[in-house]
Amino acid sequence: MSERTLFDKVWDAHTVRILPSGQTQLFIGLHLIHEVTSPQAFAMLRERHLPVLFPERTVATVDHIIPTDNRARPFADPLAEEMIQELERNCRQYGIRFYNSGSGRQGIVHVIAPEQGLTLPGMTIACGDSHTSTHGAFGAIAFGIGTSQVRDVLATQTLALSKLKVRRIEIHGKLGPGVYAKDVILHIIRKLGVKGGVGYAYEYGGSAIEAMSMEERMTLCNMSIEGGARCGYVNPDAVTFEYLRGREFAPQGSDWEEAVAWWKSLASDGNARYDDVVVFQAADIAPTVTWGITPGQGIGVDERIPAPEDLPESERELAKEAYAYMDLQPGDPIVGTPVDVCFIGSCTNGRLSDLREAAKIAKGRRVAPGVKAFVVPGSERVKQEAEQEGLREIFEAAGFEWRDPGCSMCLAMNPDRLVGRQISASSSNRNFKGRQGSPSGRTLLMSPAMVAAAAVSGKVVDVRTLL
């Protein structure tokens, strides 16, 4: 068949059958689990006396609730200790590969799977976490799922899903200095809206995407969900193959060449039919900062907060709610907004290249008085490699705290939390009310380099002035 997208090809290759409901029973090649959304799923298996059908296709780690400042057991938070003990027990009982703290492999689930070569082109991947879309950077179809679906994958290695439409999003041209993948995805969400992708898979392409590293592509695909899409992906290419070459769980030897040949065949056909195509120009994308309470409420760092009358009518009431919550006014420049906390990390921006870019800004500077700034590597491997490169010394010399891997302040299910009305500059993915631990805390989303710039300035600044 011709005129097929990668999504079509991967979907068809993993289709078990069409269910009476019209949904597709889809085989899941890799299942990733963590301590927060898996305990109830295992409990449901026990209630029904069901085994894990393919334990070798499931990989577990701890990331959401684990503290990043003190790993001594038992953890100070009894709930964290209980949930991690439960995951340890479940993995032992069912023979599931488990990367615990101190193994050298622990980290945020969407960081460790790619870095070990577990994530491969053409896979279907599921995890009880919405940012599973990250793995689409490799040309995989990856979904976040709920706890009952975690149970289904454990028991059957399949999911019942409705096939998505496909929207191709092209970014043409070259990104300017100080503009990163985080700015690209925030720009896309700003333009298409937080509900614009509902019912879609996003296929990213164009010269700006092709020029991105794999870690940048992961950032892009990671936040597809914030744009309403169920998943996002990039067609595999030479950049993909070079990243995967030699990684532990990637094909080796003669299997490698065979795998690459198949991966190449997965790319969307030149005449593939899309349900929609949207084109952006890289030159129009500036360092971007969110000012409101959804990831779609973002502006270029050199812009002012929009007035209600400048927004579509459907967005005006939410904008008024955001002005009040954030204590920001229409017409205010986003530059100069003071910050209390600066967080670099998360499955969006906790990889080695993210830390390198932030370190370039931190080097030779100091965190501003009154600002708490900390860096949370996305995995134990990222932490080790960053330390070998001297990044830890750069950050600590600048006054940043250097932490152990975990989700940290992205969702604050751990001790890393805002207090009261504190406002954070954050490299994470969501800025909802109360997202970072305090019911009244405020979040400004931006790239890691922009976070570092805010940390040393005590306020939002244009990172391009510090390059």
UniProtKB/Swiss-Prot annotation:
It comes from the Bacteria. InterPro entries: 3-IsopropMal_deHydase_lsu, Acnase/IPM_dHydase_lsu_aba_1/3, Acoase/IPM_deHydtase_lsu_aba, Aconitase_4Fe-4S_BS, Aconitase_4Fe-4S_dom, IPM_dehydratase_rel_enz, IPMI_cat. The keyword Iron-sulfur applies. Its cofactor is [4Fe-4S] cluster. One of its GO terms (molecular function) is 4 iron, 4 sulfur cluster binding. SUPFAM superfamilies: Aconitase iron-sulfur domain. Its EC number is 4.2.1.33. Binds 1 [4Fe-4S] cluster per subunit. GO terms for biological process: L-leucine biosynthetic process. It holds the Pfam family Aconitase. Keywords: 4Fe-4S, Amino-acid biosynthesis, Branched-chain amino acid biosynthesis, Iron, Iron-sulfur, Leucine biosynthesis, Lyase, Metal-binding. [4Fe-4S] cluster binds at C347, C407, C410. Pathway: Amino-acid biosynthesis; L-leucine biosynthesis; L-leucine from 3-methyl-2-oxobutanoate: step 2/4. It catalyses: (2R,3S)-3-isopropylmalate = (2S)-2-isopropylmalate. PANTHER family: 3-ISOPROPYLMALATE DEHYDRATASE, HOMOACONITASE, MITOCHONDRIAL-RELATED. Heterodimer of LeuC and LeuD. Belongs to the aconitase/IPM isomerase family. LeuC type 1 subfamily. Catalyzes the isomerization between 2-isopropylmalate and 3-isopropylmalate, via the formation of 2-isopropylmaleate. This is 3-isopropylmalate dehydratase large subunit. The lineage of its organism: Bacteria, Bacillati, Cyanobacteriota, Cyanophyceae, Synechococcales. The gene is leuC.
